[in-house]
Swiss-Prot record:
It is an enzyme of class 3 (hydrolase). It comes from the Bacteria. The gene is cas1. Transmembrane segments: none annotated. This is CRISPR-associated endonuclease Cas1.
């Protein structure tokens, strides 16, 4: 099993025999054995050619591209080896059955709210009012009849959740402050952390979907569109509070991230290269952390939990068993 590699410098990628070389514009080279690469994340300005893409396609390496501010721009992935016409038809039929689609969407958000509440209850002396508000939105969501109602309850719950961030920040006694969630563009360090973390989460989920027979463009909570892998957005809802928020709180709590790790350009606040490296290190550590799985009776990593979620969705779509989303028990 390969690993993720991150390229922050500007340069070019070349292939020599069975090794990929990254060469920066000063002539420094670093070899990356192709068998060891599972995903390649490119943050710098990097030149590559079709020969390179044809070569890595044989090994099903997923390439994710990020813009100047570190936000996800798109992916290159080879022709899928794991395909199933039956599953594709069932995945589309599930979307076309509106009542069934709403039911699936509700399970994603119920899991997300479970993990949001889990985070809040760790600081219960500071967050009790937010817990009550989100629990109320969770009840409303469970009675929803439309996707709009589901997303409305989710949006209100997440707004309350983000309002609780200052309770966390004050409790942790640090220099960060958070007014409200601003996505386009992020305008302060906390918003920059959330946006960058969510962007990484989407690419991680996409990578796990890609290993299965699921089609990443057919989704249930988020409306499918022509320019996004919307199923990764659906499944990321489950894991953002469990992984991304946990990393953010941990880094702030331990003083691992500083204001010097952020830059601002024309009102856009973003993690600079040093900040991105710090975040990715902790993010990868979180993904590799293991828990004892109650059903499988073995240790599984957080990354594997994402793929297991894909498999559970497949079983539901094939009619093998009901879908029960992950709800952290540890």
């Amino acid at each position: 099993m390969g690993r993720d590699y991150y390229i922050f410098s500007n340069g070019r990628i070349k292939r020599k025999e069975n090794t990929i070389y990254f060469e920066d514009f000063e002539g420094n080279k670093k070899g990356l054995p192709i068998e060891d690469i599972e995903r390649l994340h490119i943050f710098g300005e990097v030149d590559l050619n079709t020969k390179f893409l044809n070569y890595i396609s044989r090994y099903s390496v997923l390439i994710s591209i990020y813009n100047y501010y570190g936000f996800y721009s798109g992916s290159y992935y080879s022709k899928k080896k794991n395909v199933s016409g039956v599953l594709l038809v069932n995945q589309a039929l599930a979307y076309d059955n509106y009542e069934f689609r709403v039911a699936i969407a509700k399970t994603f958000i119920d899991s997300a709210m479970h993990h949001i509440l889990r985070n809040l209850r760790r600081y219960k002396e500071k967050t009790s009012e937010f817990v009550k508000a989100i629990e109320n939105e969770r009840k409303i969501m469970k009675e929803a009849k439309t996707i709009e109602e589901v997303m409305g309850a989710e949006g209100r719950a997440r707004k309350k959740y983000y309002e609780s961030y200052n309770a966390f920040l004050k409790f942790l006694k640090n220099d960060f402050h958070f007014n409200k969630r601003e996505k386009k563009p992020p305008n302060d360090p906390i918003n920059a952390l959330i946006s960058f973390g969510n962007s990484m989460m989407y690419t991680t989920v996409l990578g796990e979907i890609y290993k299965t027979q699921l089609d990443p463009t057919i989704s249930y909570l988020h409306e499918p569109s022509t320019k996004r892998f919307s199923l990764s957005l659906d499944l990321a809802e489950i894991f953002k509070p469990l992984i991304v928020d946990s990393v953010i709180f941990n880094m702030i709590n331990k003083g691992m991230i500083k204001k010097s790790d952020f830059d601002t350009d024309e009102g856009i606040c973003y993690l600079n290269e040093n900040g991105r490296k710090k975040f990715i290190k902790e993010y990868e550590n979180k993904l590799s952390t293991t828990v004892r799985h109650r059903t499988l009776n073995r240790n599984v990593s957080y990354r594997e939990l994402i793929r297991l979620e894909c498999y559970k969705l497949i079983k539901m779509l094939l009619g093998d068993e009901d879908y029960k989303p992950l709800k952290a028990w540890w």
